[in-house]
Amino acid sequence: MIRLSIPRFGLLAGCLLFGGALQAIAQETNEHAQENAPSVAQIVALDECDPATFNANPLIGPGFCKNVTLGAFTTLTELLDKAAHGTPDPGWDFEPDVLHIKKGTTLVVVDQGGEPHTFTEVEKFGGGFLPVLNAPGEVTIPECAGGFKNVAVAKTRILQGSQLLVPGLSKGEHLFECCIHPWMRVKVEVK
């Protein structure tokens, strides 16, 4: 038989109440932390460069295209021909094309293609810094001017297998494109 005196009972009750209060505070703090935890959204850069034809070109050089996908390949000639006719290769793409995120979300852009890309914020979509890849009549937009000699463009370059973090986007619409392959475009809506 257990005998508790009034002081011991009071002490036990007080400990239980204190423990319950601590648990409630901890749970509320955890829920608040989860609500305010920074979130991320991923964008993937894709391409289907053919290593044999891209790397054989003396202007590009060996090791440029590191495509390891099992999908179809596009030769360099095919890519240039499609761009010249205003029908860019859909294998070069950012996914998703449109993204809705909350303010405070960090974009993580991952290059899962075989060649370098940029993820450059632009005022409006337009031509990149390689005229041969621009649609007929499309001119290089200011944000892409100068290519990699422009530090602002160079900072947005992503190499095969690497990633780029884009934190702190303000509310509203943000447009991004690849300054090399200007048909690779993403619209990000920040709420």
Range-by-range predicted roles:
Residues 10-21:
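Bacterial N-terminal signal peptides
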